[in-house]
Amino acid sequence: RIMEEDNKKRQLQRAVSVFMLVVCLSAIAGGLGSATFSNYFKEVYHVDSAQRGFLEIPRESPGVLCALIISALAGFSDIGIAAVSQVLVMVGLMVMGAFSPSYGMMMIFLFIQSLGMHLFMPLNDAISMDLAREGEVGKTLGNFKSKANMCTMVTAFVIFAGYRWGFFSFEDKILKP
């Protein structure tokens, strides 16, 4: 019985560590996107303020649709949906960043990236609470959130420094379509 409890504790700790890595990587990806989107739209697509406002439709409509989408996926596990959401974020960011697609295609991939991000937000908290020890839900949520915020801040600083000192640029495409 004692070995069984020790085994459960180790499994829980491993799950917490793996999910902490996922949360940190997700925060880094989110930091890369949120810290650069406005400049990306301006430099690559030369959007004005009205167009920038219009871009909020594909960026925020997944948030409105999220309740419907999550309820439609209720038969799937939180971990499975979270994994799919991260793939959506990655595909959206990679296509926009590496290929700088046409304006219309960019809006589609912005929607895809945002859909993944909006799906992950509520699942992040749900999975965090599932991984909490009894009586430590608040502490566990705080721990995950603080690490995510730290990763986002470090990423924002790296983005700032990279553009400030010329390591990053919107002018060069990594891959040409």
PLM features: residue spans?
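Transmembrane alpha-helix termini and helix-breaking/packing motifs in multi-pass membrane transporters
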Residues: E43-V44, A67-G75, G97, V154-K176
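Hydrophobic core of transmembrane alpha-helices in multi-pass small-molecule transporters
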Residues: C24, G92-M94, G104-F120
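Intracellular juxtamembrane helix-capping segments at the cytosolic ends
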Residues: F37, L119-A132
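Helix-loop boundary and gating motifs at the non-cytosolic
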Residues: D6-G63, A148
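Cytoplasmic membrane-interface "Motif A"-like loop-to-helix N-cap segments
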Residues: A72-V87
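Glycine-rich segments within core transmembrane alpha-helices of 12-TM secondary carriers
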Residues: K139-F160
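C-terminal ends and interior cores of transmembrane alpha-helices
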Residues: V87-P101
